[in-house]
Structures are given as C-alpha cells and as structure tokens.
Amino acid sequence: MSATLWADRDFVRLWIGQTSSQLGAQASQVTLPLIAVTTLGASAGQLGVLRAVQQAPILLFALYFGALVDRWRARHLMVLADFGRAVVLGAIPIAYLLGVLGLPWLYVVAFLTGICTVCFDVAYQASLPRLVARDQLAAGNSALEGSRSAAQICGPAVGGGLISLLTAPIAAVVGSAFFVVSFLSIRRIQRPDVLATTESPGGLVRQIRAGLLLVAGHTSLRTIVIASSLYQFSFAALMTAYLLFLSRTLELPGATLGLVLAAFGPGALLGSLLSASQPRRFGYGRVVIVAALVSDGAMLCLPAVHSSVVLLIAINFVFGTFSQTVDLATMVIRQTVTPLGLQGRVAATMNFLGLGLTPVGSLVGGALAAHFGTRTALLLAALGLCLSPVTFLLSPLRKLR
C-alpha cells in the first residue's frame, strides 16, 4: 500500500474494520458448519441446507442493499451489519448453555448473519471509491484484500483451534467479538460519507434496474458476472463436499481442519501482492485467464488426496494465490469502468448474479456427497470451476490491457 494511504487515518480505520469483519466472517465459516456436524450431528444434506440458508440472502437482498447504498451512507450500513452479526452470533453459546440449540436455531442464525454479511459487503465495496482517489483504487484494493487474506489465515485457524478447546458453540463468540471491533473502528471514520449520487432518488426498482442494465450492457462486466456465476456455483458445491471430506472422510480434528482451510490465506496474501503489479505488466485479460486456469485446475487434485495434510495445504495455497489474483483484477476492472453514482448498485448486481447461485450450489454439493461420496462430489465440482477460465478465454476480456 502506498505511503499516502497509510497516512490516511480514515482509510486505516476502514482497513482495520474490514480486517476485523473478515476475521469474524472467516471464523464463522468454520464454526457454523462444524457446530452442525460435530455438535448437532447434521447429515450431508442438512449441511448443504445450512450453507444454502446462509447464502440465500444474496438472492433476496443484494439488489436492494445496492440501491440503498447509493442513497444512504454506506458506512452507516456497515456498522449496522457489524452490530447485527455480533448480536446474532453471540446468541449461539447462550442457546447452547440453555440446552435449546438445534438445527432450526442454527438455520435462523445462518440466515440472519447472511443478511448482515450481504449488507456489509455491498456497502464496503462501494465505500472505497468514495474514500480514495480513483488512481489509488488498485493500491487500496490490494491493501484491503491483503487483510482479507490475512483473515483467511487466522480466521479458520482460530475457529478450528477454539472448537478443539471450547467446543464449537462456545467458539462462536469469537466471531461476535471480531464484529464488535469492526463496528468500533468504522464508526471512528471522520470523513463525511457523501452520497455517491446526485440524481433524483426515484424508486428502488428503477435504481436497481439501472445497475442491472449497466452490467448487462458492458462487455467486461457481463463477462465477469457470467464467469463468476459459474465459479461461485461450483465453489459452493465444492466447499460443502470439502468440509465433509475433511471432517468425515479424512477424519481430521478441528485444529488440523482449521489449519488446512487457513492455507487459503497465505496464498491469497501472495495473490494480493501479485495483483498489484502483474496486470499492469502483462495486461488484465491475460493475468485473469492464466490465474483462473491455475487456481481452478489445482482443485482437481483434491479427490486424489488420501491422508497427506501437507498436500492439502499446498493445494489450498496455490488455489488461494491465483483465485485472489483473479478476484482483485476483476474488482479493479469493475470499479474503474463503473460511474461513482452506480458503484453500490453495480457491486450488488455483481454479487446477486455472481453469488446468487451459491445456495443452489451448496444443496447440489450436499446431494452429490450424499449419493456419490465426497471424492466424486469434489471432482465434479472442481470440473465445474474450470468453466470460469473457459468463459474468459472465449470473451473479448482476454485482450484487455
């Protein structure tokens, strides 16, 4: 990150808040499924339902929050989302100690945290272009995504370790604490959160339609959202099968499972560093395609693993490195070509269309694992991931400099 951004106290506060929020989210990604599997004895199908419930708010609320961000103060929505997640996750250990924790309760928690996460993510993506100059977007995104990578290192490891020490329901309180830190940091940002648009507010439907039309009509945005949809559907299926593969097929303890998943983080941190320089050197299109081929191809190796934790860590590291490169490069493309007044709606549209199939993917992953076993489910999901680089290859985006 440039010295100018480090000297910007408000950016640093955003960075701290985003990092804490990501730590909470990453820890929760481990603790919620493992509460279902280890404490409540959830089946493969029930785990798929849990992940689908957590991701369903993307379909239900992403476009609404996108329009809201462009009309309201983005940072106000971020702190509300942090507060909501802190309260909801903090209720898990209370329910456990009272003896009322069950799968229906966990489904409600997953759905409510999912709503808050959608709100935070849309507002966060729209807040950076309001806080820094356009020529600082690449450096700002690199710093923020680097912190997300650090969260991917620490979050699963912390979550998995605490599950071993405290049991999964009690460990959920850690995610709640991270969201409290994020809430306090973002609240301290002093720069006025100026509304991104001066146009007449109109109706939400009209504003949502403007975001959809821009994405549909812009070649680069349209290509990114198609590739993202294919990727996210397949990745959701893969992660549902992967959690079952690690916990039941390989029978890894919680701490080891957290360590394996945490390997995504250092790879993603390296990917953040690469994405700050390589696209300018080789061109955005070429970097996106090569990185997508390497990252998605690496996941094809998962079904062949039988006992090597080191090999699992290596696969996750490679995937983390190159998938992060793809994510950051496509994010810079999106933020650069999108007018400031449409940042929230375009971010929400991309999330809605790109992540909207993840609930279905989670259900498919659980069904495949239940009927064909986790190894076959992993193979089919990994093959689905490879459709993403094929989409980039067949589009004009491959020539983008």
Predicted feature locations:
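Flexible cytoplasmic inter-helical loops of multi-pass small-molecule transporters
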Residues: 136, 187-213
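Hydrophobic alpha-helical transmembrane segments
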Residues: 103-110, 114, 139-195, 256, ...
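Residues that mark transmembrane-helix kinks and helix-interface sites
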Residues: 30, 118-126, 131, 240, ...
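Structural signature of transmembrane alpha-helices in multi-pass secondary transporters
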Residues: 21-22, 54, 113, 144-152, ...
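C-terminal transmembrane bundle of multi-pass solute transporters/carriers
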Residues: 50, 59-63, 71, 75-78, ...
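Hydrophobic core of transmembrane alpha-helices in multi-pass small-molecule transporters
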Residues: 19, 101-119, 230, 310-325
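Helix-loop boundary and gating motifs at the non-cytosolic
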Residues: 1-56, 213, 217-264
